[in-house]
Amino acid sequence: MAAIGVHLGCTCACVAVYKDGRADVVANDAGDRVTPAVVGFLEKETIVGLAAKQSRVRNATNTIVKVKQILGRSYGDPHTQKHISESKCIVVEKVGKPKYEIDTGETQKFVSSEDVAKLIFSKMKETAQSALGSDVNDVVITVPFDFGESQKKALGEAATAAGFSILRMIHEPSAALLAYGIGQESPTGKSNVLVYKLGGTSLSVTVIEVNSGIYRVLATSTYDDIGGICFTEALAQHLASEFQRTYKQDIRGNARAMMKLMNSADVAKHALSTLGSSNCFVDSLYDGIDFDCNVSRARFELICSSLFNQCIDPIKKLLEQIGFKANDVNQVVLCGGSARIPKLQQLIKDLFPEVEMLSSIPPDEVIPVGAAIQAGILIGKENLSTDLDTITIECSASDILVKETDESGDNKFTVLLPSGTPLPARRQHVLQAPGHISSVCLELYESGGKSPVESKFAQIVLKDLQKKASGVHDILTVLTMKRDGSLHITCTDKDSGKSEMITVEETP
């Protein structure tokens, strides 16, 4: 039985298959190994991938892009509001959740982000089944390290709705290390690996300590203001300037023309990762004018010089945060489509001149390859050359906190499980509640990444406690997080022995 791994990114999706002792990304029906994470709604059909991306110029308000940005988020979430401001689609609020308003003329409907993600997962399932010639259900799915519980739940629900049975969700940096087998070569050795991921809409940098086969995240940071699309936009602006210089027409305010330029710039950007120059041709760009412009790699690098600086600074900041110097890093792993850019690779190499930089697996394929290897391990049908399962231990992605009331009556947050804790893990904490009350509500929050805002994701209520004339209730709280990220919380009144337990599932 084959095993598959799926990576759903903000701009692209990719599926890899583990079979006969190796993991490989498989091509879709268009012959491409990476599929645009774009869904278009037409009068008679729904299209996914390249066809949807190409038809967006004519069908912008019914074509959904970057859906991962709002998966599992509320309508009022700042990420959702940013997505809405950038979207060509109409997004409305339904019961506190964002939904896309689709109007093809034939029908009008409201589509959730989970529905859109389901269609992309279905495309990945079809791609894998076409390559294998048989049905496939079991899958490992990758998630960003800073994904919250609600986001993971939404991602899991979308995959399940597409017909997948989720074996496990693993963090993207862990999948990247698995793809290169990092940790298996010297299972008793210790090393530090920097995982650099430049995706379509964000940049993340993670430093992982590999020790005795265990991954431990030392630090991670994510930046949502820089991504591959920024390079595309910069090149599109340059092309618009060239058009104005040649034809004395400023098209920057014309949404349709700029979308055409964005498509051409995106193709050129990818080509310039392997070629010295690329030709940008747009048929009938504006007012019937065909636009033709050649862009060299050197010109592209000059246009994007400030963006390259933005992409390198986060590495320096993260190393400074954990007190590392460049020579404290043993390996650098490149992930994400824009990590293919030669100039960026050179700048990273300049930062780590003595460090091995791993890019033999295409950066936009390394994460799904690692996920497929993990799937192969879990299914256990393949004869693996090494015991890779010894290095698949995950870490908690965010701080898990409990809200308490201090002596002054003010709320305070106590960290029960710090981010980066190797899983599985078990922690306990004694919560004190006023003796005159007969019930205690324990609220759990998560806080991760750079945001200081805690997010409540669960609560547990302990009822029918014996009231006390004086003193406090001592409530023993035990939190257990399994390797798959599921949380099991038990609260016990130490006096009466009354107990309640809840489980917050990471995967369906």
Swiss-Prot record:
GO molecular function, one term: ATP binding
Domain of life where this protein originates: Eukaryota
Keywords recorded for this protein, A-Z: ATP-binding, Chaperone, Cytoplasm, Nucleotide-binding
GO (cellular component) term, any one: cytosol
Annotated localization: Cytoplasm, Cytosol
Keyword Cytoplasm listed: yes
Main location: cytoplasm
Main function: Component of the ribosome-associated complex (RAC), a complex involved in folding or maintaining nascent polypeptides in a folding-competent state.
PANTHER family: HEAT SHOCK PROTEIN 70KDA
Subunit: Component of ribosome-associated complex (RAC).
Protein name: Heat shock 70 kDa protein 14
Species of the source: Xenopus tropicalis (Western clawed frog)
